[in-house]
Amino acid sequence: MSVTVFITYDLAPGVTKDQYWEWSREIDQPMASRQPGVLSYEIVWIDGTGTGETPSQVVEVIEAESWEAWQKVNEYPEMQAAVASFFQIAEKSSIRVFYGTKIEG
């Protein structure tokens, strides 16, 4: 059964929204979305909340064949440069990873 993975984070100090968007479009999304086990890969820039406080700037929403399949993605040789650049783009202390199963209606 597939899982949905949510990764939330803020940008590292000094990284602008424009720099992030360019990196996301040119490196991250094309690379990660074509890896084995990844069914869909979407990035959402958070514009705001109903409460005024934004807990994260970015949410990645990934549909994967399984949690184990997703865990393998960052180990693939093709992903090494993207992973290294991610840790320069994202504020490490802000990264949170959640996964779960959709409740079908």
Which residues does each predicted region cover?
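Short, well-ordered beta-strand segments in beta-rich or mixed alpha/beta enzyme
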Residues: V3-L11, I43-P77
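Intrinsically disordered, low-complexity N-terminal regions enriched in serine/proline/glycine
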Residues: T8, Q19, S40, E75, ...
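Residue-level signal for secondary-structure boundary sites
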Residues: V15, E68-W70, G105
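Short amphipathic alpha-helical segments
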Residues: T16-I43, E78-V83
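Functionally constrained cores in energy, signaling, and assembly domains
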Residues: S24, D28-A32, E60-A64, W70, ...
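Glycine-rich beta-strand-turn "strand-cap" elements at beta-sheet edges
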Residues: L39-V59, A82-G105
